[in-house]
Amino acid sequence: MKSVQFCFLFCCWRVICCKSCELTNITITVEKEECRFCMSINATWCAGYCYTRDLVYKDPARPNNQKTCTFKELVYETVKVPGCAHQADSLYTYPVATECHCGKCDSDSTDCTVQGLGPSYCSFSEMKE
């Protein structure tokens, strides 16, 4: 029986430790309206699980802040979008996470919706790799 308990605890520990909030590689789609097409690029962003809870009884004296895996530090990188008209600005600047943590989602700089457009959304039909 002790070996079963140990195995259960080990599996729980493994899930918590391995799926924590951390940097991960993602592919995002960038677009410039002036260029009329999209381009896929690789970037680093935060992904994983954070301990959170949703109270059954809402207490106004105790705010219910859900924690999410989000960036703690980020830098901006710039890529040149090919195929733009000569007068158009062909540079696209995007954020790249360098450090992650579990914290409150900042809606001023992050899409905090339950399901956003997603990193591969493109409003144009033509896609460049």
Swiss-Prot record:
Glycan attachment positions? N25, N42
> Which cysteine-cysteine pairs are annotated as disulfide bonds in the entry?
C21-C69, C35-C84, C38-C122, C46-C100, C50-C102, C105-C112
Q: Where in the cell is it found?
A: Secreted
Which Gene3D superfamilies does the protein's record reference? Answer: Cystine-knot cytokines
Keyword tags: Disulfide bond, Glycoprotein, Hormone, Secreted, Signal
The secretion signal range is 1-18
Predominant location of this chain? secreted
| GO cellular component assignments | cytoplasm; extracellular space; follicle-stimulating hormone complex
On the tree of life, the source organism's domain of life is Eukaryota
Q: Which GO terms describe its biological process?
A: follicle-stimulating hormone signaling pathway; G protein-coupled receptor signaling pathway; positive regulation of steroid biosynthetic process; regulation of signaling receptor activity; transforming growth factor beta receptor signaling pathway
**Per the record's keyword annotation, is Signal included, yes or no?**
yes
Q: Does the keyword Metal-binding apply?
A: no
- State a single Gene Ontology molecular function: follicle-stimulating hormone activity
Q: Which InterPro entries match?
A: Cystine-knot_cytokine, Glyco_hormone_CN, Gonadotropin_bsu, Gonadotropin_bsu_CS
Sorted alphabetically, which SMART domains does this protein's record hold?
A: GHB
Give the similarity note: Belongs to the glycoprotein hormones subunit beta family.
* Subunit and interaction comment: Heterodimer. The active follitropin is a heterodimer composed of an alpha chain/CGA shared with other hormones and a unique beta chain/FSHB shown here.
What's this protein's function?
Together with the alpha chain CGA constitutes follitropin, the follicle-stimulating hormone, and provides its biological specificity to the hormone heterodimer. Binds FSHR, a G protein-coupled receptor, on target cells to activate downstream signaling pathways. Follitropin is involved in follicle development and spermatogenesis in reproductive organs.
Q: What is this protein called?
A: Follitropin subunit beta
Source organism of this protein record: Panthera tigris altaica (Siberian tiger)
